[in-house]
Structure formats: structure tokens, C-alpha cells
């Protein structure tokens, strides 16, 4: 196994035993990126000098000492571009570190570069980036998912040992599933949002994308914790997630299967893979019980009312006056605002701003926005009732595997449905984990989702860890080319 193929845990063992130096690790990874990234375009910015310099000063005794981490382009890193893959933020340099970056630095991590994304995190394919399209390492004719597609593609292609993404409606979990990675959306308030460029403030959450569940637990442990700069941050002790993975008794564990998530329209191979996952847990002694989340059918509509309403307010701050792109030819201030935003925002961002402004308008506020808030509470109540019968839920992460580039761009509704199984988790503010469970006959990764109650990340992490441990999961090396023959799972046969 080559150095860049290692998990964070394996890399840390070599670093601690001084079998490899942080400088060698960074140099090895930069070589891998130079070789591979022209094929998939996961990174939009690399700071070679800073990474190499940091590697020479790395403190191996720290939890992430010497480990390079990739960062999604909507998370502020002092002195680096933070353009959110948008033209309107061209030339903008972050004037401060976000809280998660401060925590990574204190843990000894080396910041490697910034990954591509859908503009302002609005999208499910990373096709909405103003910088260029990221491709799926398993088939470069396919999307990596979104909006954290660059982070997922980088980890899957072994261009990063781990990465940070953000998840507003599935933007960590869906690309993780499409690329064959582990993606964790923490409970809302577990991880500080300070320094994350806001899309929908009541739904956004930063989380890790990794090669293994063990690595996700370690990163969550590092980035979690109360932050006075984020008024939605909860003042709770941070569990030792990485130490709570082992020795979890499964004898009395009940895993709920929401019937609303196993509907017509799910790809047959996804359904088959999920059936095998359920069967595997049953063999481990887990009790499987069907549950109902009756308001699930309303989740997508509810999400796109609330998220776009918040986006229209949050993105009003970008006008080109203090920083970023600005129109050069205009007649007056109103004309300036219009032209700057028209030139700076992409079509999907404009669509969502228009929709959000519409649902907040005086004639429709009660009919749409207030009603959506009520449905959001109903969805949250559904999960609370379900968790009275079980400790976690198991669902598909996505109803299908990665789709072809350009396949859904002309039909926004079809694109929005890519997140149909992930959106409700954000509306409820709870935690969820996407784990690879196989590959299709075309060689495309399939993922399943474990959903846990608020503040119970250790439950789903332990359940995911047991799955990977008992199936012998080893992060595979993708072909980085066109269509390949697939079939068979990584750990379980299909």
C-alpha cells in the first residue's frame, strides 16, 4: 500500500513511530495531486509553500499532528482565497480563521488546499462551480455529488487523507456516497459555524469526509465544541468519539427502517445493496424494526422553501462594494447592484435567491414560509417518535448512484431529488453518517445512511465502525477514468 492510500489512523501510527516524516507525507500527497487532479479537478487552490513549511514544524504528539487536511472553499482560512466557487468573491482573501480551522491547527493538522464545490453550496453535483466541474474518480464522466464534491473526490482519489465539507441538505453525505467515502453530518450546534460562509444558517453544519469511520470519529472529536462566536453552538462536553467505537453491545440494539425511504424509484442495485447491509446487521445480532416517518414526503418542498428564504437574506450581503467582483458599467446604485449580482452569481444561485425572495414576500409569507416552519417541526417530531422505538435508523443515502455530467442540469427538480433521503436530517437538526456498502455493475459506489438522535453521534459512529470492521473494509483505489466493469462490494458481495 502506498503512503497516500493510508487512512488517518494508519498515517498517524507511522508518524508517531517515526517511520515517515510530515514533510515526506506532504511531498508524497502533492505528487499524487499533481498526477491525479488534472483528471478530476478536486482542488481549486493549493498552498504548496504553506503546507511544506507547516510540515517541517508539525508536532507529532498532537491528535492530528502531521496530517494534511483538505478544506471546502466556503470555510475561511486566514490569508487564503474563500470564493465559495463564485465569481462574485473573486479576489477575496479570508481575514480570519474559522473556528474549525483554529481547532485543526491546534490539533496539529496541516492545511493542504481548498476543494471545489457548488457555488455557495447550492447544488448536488459540483456542476454549479464558476471555476470548473469536478469529476467522479470512479468514472470521470459522472458527477462526484455536491455540494462538497471536491472534498469527496479528493478523499476518494487519495488526494487527501481527509477533508472538511458542509452539509445543508445532504452536501457531505450524498457526495460521500457517490464517491465511496465516509461522510458525517453532525448534530446542529455540535460544530461551530463561525467562519463558514452561510447558505441557510438554520440548516448548515460543518463535518468530515474521510476514508473510514474511525477517521470520521477522530476528526469530529477535534472540530466539535462550544464556540461563543456562534450563538447556535451548544455548550456540551465533547465525547471521546474515537474511543467509543469498540465494544458496543448489539444484543438489544434496535435499528429502525423507515418505510418512507424504501419507495418506488430507488435504483435496483441500491436497493439490493441496502438489503445486504440490513442482513449483515441482523447476523451481528441487531434487531431490525420497520418505523414510519409520515411527513417525509413533504421534506423536499419544506427544505426548498426554508433554505432559499435564508439564502436570499444571507446572499444580500454580497454586492461587490467592499470586496469581490463588481460591475464596471452602470447608471446608478440600483443598476450597479443588479449588474454586479447578475455578473457575479451563477444561474442556480439566482434561481434560489428568486425563490427565497418570493416565499418571503408579503403576499406569500404565511402561505409558504410559515407553513414550511410548521412542517419542519412535524418532521422533527417524526424522528423523535421513531427514536422511542429504536436507537438509530438505516436508509439509502441516495436513491441512485452518481449520474452523468450534464444529465440533470436542465431539470432542477430532478437535481433536487438527489437529496431526497438526506434533507429531512437537516430539517430535524439531528446527526447522520453515510458509509460505502458496495459498487454497482458499472463500478459506481453505493452508500447507506445511519441516522441518530441529536447528540448521539457516538451511536451511529459505533454502528458504522462495526460494519466496516466486520466486512473487512479497505478504502479502494478508484480507476480515475471512464466507465469500468463493476459488481461486488468492498467487503460484501452484491
UniProtKB/Swiss-Prot annotation:
Keyword Metal-binding appears in the UniProt entry: no
Active-site annotation: 72 (charge relay system), 147 (charge relay system), 171 (acyl-ester intermediate)
Highest taxon in the source lineage: Bacteria
Record keywords: ATP-binding, Ligase, Nucleotide-binding, Protein biosynthesis
GO-annotated biological processes: translation
InterPro entries, A to Z: Amidase, Amidase_CS, Amidase_dom, AS_sf, GatA
Enzyme Commission number(s) of this protein: 6.3.5.7
Catalytic reaction list: L-glutamyl-tRNA(Gln) + L-glutamine + ATP + H2O = L-glutaminyl-tRNA(Gln) + L-glutamate + ADP + phosphate + H(+)
Record bears the keyword Ligase: yes
Top-level EC class as recorded in UniProt: ligase
GO cellular component, one term: glutamyl-tRNA(Gln) amidotransferase complex
Gene Ontology molecular function: ATP binding; glutaminyl-tRNA synthase (glutamine-hydrolyzing) activity
Family: Belongs to the amidase family. GatA subfamily.
Subunit structure: Heterotrimer of A, B and C subunits.
Role this protein plays: Allows the formation of correctly charged Gln-tRNA(Gln) through the transamidation of misacylated Glu-tRNA(Gln) in organisms which lack glutaminyl-tRNA synthetase. The reaction takes place in the presence of glutamine and ATP through an activated gamma-phospho-Glu-tRNA(Gln).
HAMAP family: GatA (MF_00120)
Protein name: Glutamyl-tRNA(Gln) amidotransferase subunit A
